């Protein structure tokens, strides 16, 4: 595997020179953050990002993410225009030497948590998800503002989007995902980009919205939509691991054995009840995911792709983007490296 780290560009408090100092760190996972969703990413912006990263002795290994416009997910007549823009962005990325793109198909909201600064017993702060809190929350109230959410919506436009989704069933969303995949994958194949869909986080419906990339059966169905080795998965242990029915090592061996895992997020979570969890340190005993068994599965399939530590706790007084501080993710990266060295020896 190739160890990577998420970086949110020049405004990120976690500097590239700090990331470079993490033992074994090779690559960066990033994106262009100042182009509106649905717009074409200019080649010069991609090159500027890549060159900045390379000046620090790292490589731009994965784009996470190129967002999918809501009109595509809703199946609106305007989707074709946004799909053409998406294709052009893929062409620009390939021309800049990028070969892996992570994306998701979660309606309206990206990853969702009920609290960003829950204090754990050791004094660190973590992201948590409590189903009873979310079920009582009105997404229009402004009570929850999460880093994973698209804050470009004004309250009225968000209300309109949520209203539109009341007419969209899971099967409708599958139809729209199929349309999107079958439209973009010929271009991805043409330019040599591996597309890696990220599972829904958490892997169940929230606020009455359909979510369809949640388990092994869903991923099988996804891969059946288009026959290409470039059509694949971001295997996220934190997202899929929130549901204890998901056997992560088995899924890694199954999909990785097909060569369909193009990118991996390795993190731990502690399940605290039905549809509830806390994000924990990466250490196996800190949560519900057997990290050693998971990394061994990656080793056994000969995984050589990019893998990154995912959300970390806030520790040692660090302040910054929830889940994306330096210290705990650096500890996580070193822990993952240690497991990899052990299973490889």
From Swiss-Prot:
The gene is uxuA2. InterPro entries: Man_deHydtase, Xyl_isomerase-like_sf. It comes from Halalkalibacterium halodurans (strain ATCC BAA-125 / DSM 18197 / FERM 7344 / JCM 9153 / C-125). One of its GO terms (biological process) is D-glucuronate catabolic process. This is Mannonate dehydratase 2. Its EC number is 4.2.1.8. Belongs to the mannonate dehydratase family. Its cofactor is Fe(2+); Mn(2+). One of its GO terms (molecular function) is ferrous iron binding. Keywords: Iron, Lyase, Manganese.
């Amino acid at each position: 595997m190739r160890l990577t780290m998420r970086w949110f560009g020049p405004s990120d408090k976690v500097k590239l020179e700090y990331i470079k100092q993490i033992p074994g760190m090779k690559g960066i996972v990033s994106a262009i953050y100042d182009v509106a969703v649905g717009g074409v990413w200019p080649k010069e912006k991609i090159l500027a990002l890549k060159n900045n990263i390379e000046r620090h002795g790292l490589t731009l290994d994965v784009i996470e993410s190129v967002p999918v416009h809501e009109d595509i997910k809703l199946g609106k007549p305007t989707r074709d225009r946004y799909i053409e823009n998406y294709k052009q962005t893929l062409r620009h990325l390939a021309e800049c030497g990028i070969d892996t793109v992570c994306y998701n198909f979660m309606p309206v909201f990206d990853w969702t948590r009920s609290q960003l600064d829950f204090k754990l017993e050791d004094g660190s702060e973590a992201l948590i998800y409590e189903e009873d809190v979310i079920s009582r929350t009105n997404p229009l109230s402004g009570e929850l503002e999460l880093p994973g959410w698209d804050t470009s919506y004004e309250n009225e436009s968000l209300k309109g989007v949520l209203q539109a989704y009341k007419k969209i069933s899971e099967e409708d969303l599958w139809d729209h995902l199929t349309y999107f995949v079958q439209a973009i994958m010929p271009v991805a194949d043409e330019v040599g980009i591996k597309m890696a869909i990220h599972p829904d986080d958490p892997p169940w419906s929230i606020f009455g919205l359909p979510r369809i990339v949640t388990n092994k059966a869903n991923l099988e169905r996804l891969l059946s939509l288009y026959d290409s080795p470039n059509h694949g998965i971001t295997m996220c242990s934190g997202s899929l691991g929130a549901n204890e029915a998901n056997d992560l090592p088995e899924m890694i061996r199954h999909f990785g054995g097909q060569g369909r895992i193009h990118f991996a997020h390795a993190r731990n979570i502690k399940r605290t009840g039905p549809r509830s969890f806390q994000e924990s340190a990466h250490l196996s005993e800190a949560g519900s995911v057997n990290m050693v068994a998971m990394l061994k599965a990656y080793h056994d399939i000969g995984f050589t792709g990019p893998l990154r530590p995912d959300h970390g706790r806030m520790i040692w007084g660090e302040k910054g983007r929830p889940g994306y501080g330096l210290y705990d993710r650096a500890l996580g990266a070193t822990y993952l490296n240690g497991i990899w060295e052990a299973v490889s020896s």
